[in-house]
Amino acid sequence: MKGEKKMKIKRGFILAAAVSVLVLGCMALTSCGSDTAGKGGNITVISREDGSGTRGAFIELFGIEEITNGEKMDMTVDTADITNSTSVMMTSVSGNVRAIGYISLGSLNDSVKALNVDGAEATAENIKNGTYKVSRPFNIVTKDNVSEVTGDFIKFIQSQEGQKVVEDNHYISEANTGNYAGTKPSGKIVVSGSSSVTPVMEKLKEAYSDLNPNAEIEIQQSDSTTGVTNALSGVCDIGMASRELKDSEKEKGASATVIALDGIAVIVNNENPLNNITSEQVKQIYTGETTGWDDIH
């Protein structure tokens, strides 16, 4: 009897242990399904605000728009979370394992992961060689008759020294105009607009200020549309736009000068196992056709 009782107790322990392992395994699988992006669960779509040049370029490059009554309509799914700057976008994606977003390639850091798009890695070199096709211009926008100091700053941006600043900060330079030979005029310059252009503009400001301490430069971060509007109205001397000018803006007297090319990186949380995505999949996610990570293969 004692031997039989011991055997029953032993079997009971084995059964309990087996159940425990099964329960823990189920819990682990459930946890993986709910906490790890790319292995189930809904996609959290994050976009930029209306007026953002990055959003405008993104929807155009990925075809997230339709022509209705002769006008382009943004077809971004209405359940998308909206962020108002590059930094907020990165913070939002880094804090949500199921999130997807997009940012200026020049602003990319290790807090998020950039996906390869159509098999090409998001790098400045791949933009130069044409394999990574998701790119757009960085423009500075002015109206007629800029001040002497504003004109001198623009000459610096376009110079060999200015374009070196662009390249050193992981953007793609445009053809430079040679060595900077400014006259170091004094005065204040107000620069306003795109949060994507702002980081490189801050670096250009620093480099120019070293050469011309007589200039005072104030940078106001907002979005591309605000930058263009402020340049046209005289609120700022230079507008920043991370997109091409609209015909309506040109008709009002806005003039754009390309100072760099930049890619748009499609980003996910670092815990997301996904590394590659196609342009069509990005479009389907942002139009709401695809809603789950299980649908991305």
Across the structure, where does each feature detected by a protein language model lie?
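Short, Lys/Arg-enriched N-terminal segments with co-localized hydrophobic residues
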Residues: 1-6
